[in-house]
């Protein structure tokens, strides 16, 4: 991992969403230099399912060698942002670095995204980033080491990244467009850049999206903290860049990336918005039967599902059903399968003992999954991760995403039997 150099000693770093995850990791990295950290986040009281508050984060920052100012901030609230900025300036004398980390996510298509979720993502991601930057900029302009760092992706206009989750993409790209505009607007005064991970990072959000076992396909938050630290060390002239964590660390001489892996040697899940995957990710993903999202398939096409493979898969699923599984799941799934042995199938995990069958379910499905028969068999046999299938466009989901994630647990139980 990247060693600290003391470069940020005495600097004041304002970080949104710093009570946990990547935001807290960046805070702790800076704290090791003796930086002043403003923890601008909503969590003042412990969440029943998520670890950490602004106050527990403050204690960790102090233990790491930094000074901490916990501030209750919902980035949708302009008054809370302004108040936190004023407190930071009063306590530490100014602001040197701003990290716009707070973000909201919903990986749902247009018709399945409630207006409330659209507003949340737009107001947290785009508007929150813009307003926090606006509030900090007058003080950043006075700093000799001024940086704004948005945790947002490169502006990739490939339609793939819009069709599955249009609202989320627009909201994240709004953060990236702040980089594009502000880097030019404040050139010479403030370095404005974006940072994005090459692979999935293990956070509470990733656990929610990927379900049980996804952590083995992720890297630790430390890789993003180290990459951010590299950026903070650069001069103001380093601006307007869309940086990938792995790339900048390679430039710093880091060669062993297994130290960042949750499970060293395990194939990693590529993150959103990146068309090209490094050879390491592609090779490891292929060895597990997965296909990165836009890998060009110049090799032989995947073999078709053997005759009756879908029926056999459902038979094994049915034999494995139990009242406990039904009780834990409580959902009806409908599968729209294309290709050989295709058609409409259902998996009823609401009725006593569970049930499967060909055709539409008698009750309305909670989740409708559309994919090829080949990918269906691969998913239930563990050769294709549902998260990877969804990200690559191989799997389309309509309905309740939380219930869709529950199905992955059942798939994991099938792996040893298929």
From Swiss-Prot:
One function term, GO molecular function aspect: oxidoreductase activity
GO cellular component: mitochondrion; peroxisome
N6-acetyllysine sites (modified residues): 116
Top EC group: oxidoreductase
EC number, as in UniProt: 1.-.-.-
Residue numbers binding NADP(+): 17-23, 42, 74, 172
Modified residues (N6-succinyllysine): 318
Keyword Acetylation in record: yes
Keyword Oxidoreductase: yes
Active site as annotated: 168
GO terms, biological process: cholesterol homeostasis
Residue numbers bearing the N6-(2-hydroxyisobutyryl)lysine modification: 42
Subcellular location: Peroxisome; Mitochondrion
Residues in SCP2 domain copies: 306-415
Principal place of residence: other
Protein keywords: Acetylation, Hydroxylation, Mitochondrion, NADP, Oxidoreductase, Peroxisome
Family the UniProt entry places it in: Belongs to the short-chain dehydrogenases/reductases (SDR) family.
Function: Has apparently no steroid dehydrogenase activity. Controls bile acid (BA) and lipid metabolism in response to nutritional cues.
Protein name as it appears in the record: Hydroxysteroid dehydrogenase-like protein 2
Species whose genome carries this gene: Bos taurus
Upper classification of the organism: Eukaryota, Metazoa, Chordata, Craniata, Vertebrata
